[in-house]
Amino acid sequence: MSKLSHPQVLEQIKYGLIASCQPVDNGPMDSPEIVAAMAQASVIGGAAGLRIEGIENLKATRNVVNVPIIGIVKRDLPDSPVRISPFLQDIEELAAAGADIIAFDGTDRVRPTTREAIIKRIKELGCLAMADCSNFEEGMYCHNLGVEIIGSTMSGYTGGEIPAEPDYQLVKDLNAAGCRVMAEGRYNTPELAKTAIEIGAYSVTVGSALTRLEHIVSWFADAVKSAK
C-alpha cells in the first residue's frame, strides 16, 4: 500500500488516467521486472495510477512507484465465469502485496465467494474497493454495498459479440446515480479516454493500447497489410 490515505488516493486518481500494465500471458514481456518497468514508464508519462494483475507483479511494482495501485488476481475457474479476484485469499494477498484499491468481479454470476464477503474483507484489510461490473444494476448493487469505485470493466464481456466502442451510456448512468465511475473497456485512443472524463467518469483505465505491445504492433501491421 502507498503512504496515501483513502481520501488522498481518491483525489490523486480523480479525472486521471490509470495505466493497466498487464502483458500478454506467457508472452516475452510477462515478468514482474518488465511489468514494474512498464509501470514506471507509465507514471513518467503522466499516469495518475496503475492497475496491476498478479501478486508478484504487484510486489515488484509497489517497490518502484508511489502512485495508487489497483490490484487484481485473474483466475480461470472450472465452475464459474468469474475471473477477477474471486477468492478471499486473493483479497488478502493483494492487500499484503501493497494494493491501495482492490478490484473484483462485481457481476451477478455464479461465483465461489459472494460479493458481500469480498467487499467486507477488502474493507477489513484497509483497502478501497472497486467493482468491475457489466451493467447498471450490478454497479448500483455494489455501490449500495459501500464499494468506492464502480468500473464499467465487464460491459461487453459477459457473453455475445464484444462491441467495438466503449459503453458510454453505462458511464453516464452510473455517474448520474452518484457513483465514482472508472471508465474501462475499449478506451483505446486518447480521444476516447478524453470523452470518458467529459461524460462523467471519475477516472479512465487504458490497458492494451498502452502496454500490450503485441496488440499494438498487430494493429499497425494489419493496417499496413490491408493497403495492398
From Swiss-Prot:
InterPro entries, per the entry: Aldolase_TIM, NanE, RibuloseP-bd_barrel
GO molecular function, one term: N-acylglucosamine-6-phosphate 2-epimerase activity
GO-annotated cellular components: cytosol
Enzyme Commission (EC) number: 5.1.3.9
Pathway: Amino-sugar metabolism; N-acetylneuraminate degradation; D-fructose 6-phosphate from N-acetylneuraminate: step 3/5
BP GO terms, sorted: carbohydrate metabolic process; N-acetylmannosamine catabolic process; N-acetylneuraminate catabolic process
PANTHER family named in the record: N-ACETYLMANNOSAMINE-6-PHOSPHATE 2-EPIMERASE-RELATED
Functional summary from the UniProt entry: Converts N-acetylmannosamine-6-phosphate (ManNAc-6-P) to N-acetylglucosamine-6-phosphate (GlcNAc-6-P).
Family, as annotated: Belongs to the NanE family.
Protein name: Putative N-acetylmannosamine-6-phosphate 2-epimerase
Organism encoding this protein: Pasteurella multocida (strain Pm70)
Record lineage: Bacteria, Pseudomonadati, Pseudomonadota, Gammaproteobacteria, Pasteurellales
Gene (UniProt): nanE
